[in-house]
Regions:
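Juxtamembrane inter-helical linkers in multi-pass membrane proteins
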Residues: 60-81
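Loop-to-transmembrane boundary segments
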Residues: 78-98
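Active-site and channel-lining beta-strand-loop segments
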Residues: 5-37
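Alpha-helical transmembrane segments and their immediate juxtamembrane interface regions
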Residues: 108-151
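Transmembrane helix-loop junctions in multipass membrane proteins, especially transporters and channels
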Residues: 8-13, 55-66, 110-117, 147-151
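Hydrophobic alpha-helical membrane-insertion segments
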Residues: 1-4, 44-48, 91-99
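Alpha-helical transmembrane segments and their membrane-interface junctions
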Residues: 93-113
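Alpha-helical transmembrane segments
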Residues: 31-53, 127-133
Length: 151
């Protein structure tokens, strides 16, 4: 949070808040606490949601969305345990990657606000697309491992 406060103080009175695919600003906002801290607030809310929902997997396994759920629900508690651990690890990995994405988006907005031409850093689009591919890879990796444990 200290970094967000420090960055907020250095923002101009109006800064870019939305960018097109090429990193050119196409939306602007006035400097205010809400507009700057909404992204960290959403990030924290998402992290909190994932933190609190993950333990519910064990209490309400019928709500887990995994391949072979019917077979999973029929397993003994002992055989369900490795699946729960994998599902918890998956949620943890996604939470970490999403936090890093939100942090990067905030950094890119700050960087654009202070740069000539207000452009996002040139690698921003690649990072955001790469993030999506990486998350998809994580999900596939864990779902394959979960399927192996259920079979």
């Amino acid at each position: 949070m200290v970094g967000y406060v420090w960055a907020y103080q250095s923002l101009p009175l109006r800064y870019p808040s939305h960018f097109n695919f090429d990193g050119v600003p196409d939306g602007w906002t006035d400097k205010n606490l809400f507009s700057w801290f909404i992204i960290p607030a959403i990030s924290l809310a998402l992290l909190s949601f994932m933190y609190f929902i993950t333990p519910l997997f064990r209490k309400y396994p019928q709500f887990i969305n995994i391949p072979g759920k019917e077979k999973f629900l029929e397993l003994s508690d002992e055989r369900k345990e490795p699946v729960f651990k994998l599902a918890e690890n998956l949620m943890g990995m996604i939470a970490i990657v999403e936090q890093l994405l939100f942090l990067y988006i905030q950094y890119a907005m700050w960087s654009a606000a202070l740069s000539p031409g207000n452009m996002m850093p040139p690698h921003s689009t690649l990072i955001i697309i790469g993030h999506s591919v990486f998350v998809l890879g994580i999900v596939i990796f864990y779902l394959v491992k979960i399927s192996d444990k259920i079979d």
